[in-house]
Amino acid sequence: MNRMSTIFLKIALVLIGIPILALCIFLVPKVANYSAELFPNIAYIKYLVFIYLYVTAIPFYFALYQAFKLLSYIDKNKAFSGLSVRALKNIKYCAVTISIFYAAGMPVFYLMAEIDDAPGIIVIGLVIIFASMVIAVFAAVLQKLLKEAIDIKSENDLTV
C-alpha cells in the first residue's frame, strides 16, 4: 500500500478521535447534568451517566489505537502477520464491547426519552449499537481473511 494512503488514513483516525474527545469534554457533563434534572429523586444518576459515557469512550479510543497500529504494520510491510490479526481481533472486541455497553444503557435512554418526549435519543443509541456491530462483523471477516492469507502464505513459503 502506498505510504501516502496510510498517512491519509492515520490522519483520518485522528480526525475521528478529536470530535469524540470534544464530546467527552463538553457534552458529557451537560448530558449528566440534564439527566440529574430529569431524575431529581435519583441522586446518583449524574455520576452514573458520567461513568457510563466515559467508560464507553475507552474501548472506542483503544480501537482507534489498534487501527493506528494496523496502519503502522502496513507501512512496515508486516500486514500479513499475527500482529495484524491480533489488532483486528482487538478492534472486533472493542466494537462488541461498545455495543454491549450501549445496549445495557438503552433503558436509561428510554426513560430520558419518555420524560423529555424526545424519541431521537433512542434512535441515537440504536445507531451506535448497530454501527458498532457492523464494525465488529467487518473486523471479524477481515481477521478471518487475513488469517487464511497468512496460512496460505506460510504454506507457499514452505513449498519452495
UniProtKB/Swiss-Prot annotation:
Q: Where in the cell is it found?
A: Cell membrane
Entry-linked Pfam families = DUF2975 (PF11188)
Coiled coil, from the record:
none
Q: Which membrane topology describes this protein? A: Multi-pass membrane protein
Write out the transmembrane intervals.
7-27, 48-68, 95-115, 121-141
* Keywords, sorted A to Z: Cell membrane, Membrane, Transmembrane, Transmembrane helix
Q: What's the superkingdom here?
A: Bacteria
Stated name of the protein = Uncharacterized membrane protein YoaS
Q: Where the protein is mainly located, per its record?
A: membrane
Q: Gene Ontology cellular component?
A: plasma membrane
Q: Listed disulfide bonds for this chain?
A: none
